[in-house]
């Protein structure tokens, strides 16, 4: 092996015929060389042996990646893939997904998802949504802006409910916000879009309203407000006021 050939292995760069491809590991480089630059045809090997009877490269005899090793590697990849999918799904349900870079938007129409209302089972923990049932329309129109707040992210439940389970779908993760046609290939893309794409568009109802006009998203918030700003008046104070 020449010095240049040896150096190519240390740099993980293929030097065969000016190929120049770079690989992350030595194993990947060797596999590339065996697949693309070394002949495995028995007739070619026999011809080379006849031409050079005193020397035959070991690469033709002892392959680094044998057929058995390749089959084992493919089998291992198939076993790892379902576990990776389960890990991603679990990460979405917990909402623990790191912020990824932005992705380009898709052109497919997102599936129709049911409207997210204050009566949803996850309203108290992750309130989201921008559309409500028809029977609430009259109340919404007469309500003031004080009864609304903005939400900076879409819940994991909403993302999972809009996920396309078709295995052939290139971008299965669709934005659940009605009218948004954004689709993404992975969980990180849709989570980043959900966190930043509709920061000022999503309005969430604050259904717990005080007689003074203030509204709150939870009963605990309304109770805290009442205790601090509208404390109960004792019977003794009422009698003194009537005197």
Curated annotation (Swiss-Prot):
The name this protein goes by in its record: Juxtaposed with another zinc finger protein 1
An example Gene Ontology CC term for this record: fibrillar center
Annotated site residue numbers, Breakpoint for translocation to form JAZF1-SUZ12 oncogene: 129-130
Species annotation: Homo sapiens (Human)
Zn finger (C2H2-type) start-end: 12-37, 173-198, 208-230
Coiled-coil residue spans: none
Clinical note on disease: A chromosomal aberration involving JAZF1 may be a cause of endometrial stromal tumors. Translocation t(7;17)(p15;q21) with SUZ12. The translocation generates the JAZF1-SUZ12 oncogene consisting of the N-terminus part of JAZF1 and the C-terminus part of SUZ12. It is frequently found in all cases of endometrial stromal tumors, except in endometrial stromal sarcomas, where it is rarer. Translocation t(6;7)(p21;p22) with PHF1.
GO molecular function, one term: transcription corepressor activity
Tissue specificity comment: Highest expression in testis with moderate levels in colon, placenta, prostate and ovary and low levels in brain, spleen, liver and small intestine.
UniProt keyword list: Chromosomal rearrangement, Lipid metabolism, Metal-binding, Nucleus, Phosphoprotein, Proto-oncogene, Repeat, Transcription, Transcription regulation, Zinc, Zinc-finger
Gene designation: JAZF1
Predominant localisation class: nucleus
Subunit (UniProt): Interacts with NR2C2 (via ligand-binding region).
């Amino acid at each position: 092996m020449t010095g240049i050939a040896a150096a190519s292995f240390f740099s993980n760069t293929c030097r065969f015929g000016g190929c120049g491809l770079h690989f992350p590991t030595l194993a990947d480089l060797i596999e590339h060389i065996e697949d693309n630059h070394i002949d495995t045809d028995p007739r070619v090997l026999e011809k080379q042996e006849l031409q050079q009877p005193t020397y035959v490269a070991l690469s033709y005899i002892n392959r680094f990646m044998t057929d058995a090793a390749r089959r084992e590697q493919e089998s291992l990849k198939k076993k790892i893939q379902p576990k990776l999918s389960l890990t991603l799904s679990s990460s979405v349900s917990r909402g623990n997904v790191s912020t990824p870079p932005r992705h380009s938007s898709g052109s497919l129409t997102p599936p129709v998802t049911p409207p997210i209302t204050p009566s949803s089972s996850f309203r108290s923990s992750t309130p989201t949504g921008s559309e409500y049932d028809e029977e609430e329309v009259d109340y919404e129109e007469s309500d003031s802006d004080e009864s609304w707040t903005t939400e900076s992210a879409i819940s994991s439940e909403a993302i999972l409910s809009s996920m396309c389970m078709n295995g052939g779908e290139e971008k299965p993760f669709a934005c659940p916000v009605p009218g948004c046609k954004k689709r993404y290939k992975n969980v990180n893309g849709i989570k980043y879009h959900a966190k930043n794409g509709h920061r000022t568009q999503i309005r969430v109802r604050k259904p717990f309203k005080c007689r003074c006009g203030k509204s709150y998203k939870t009963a605990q918030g309304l109770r805290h407000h009442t205790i601090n700003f509208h404390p109960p008046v004792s019977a003794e104070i009422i009698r003194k006021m009537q005197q």
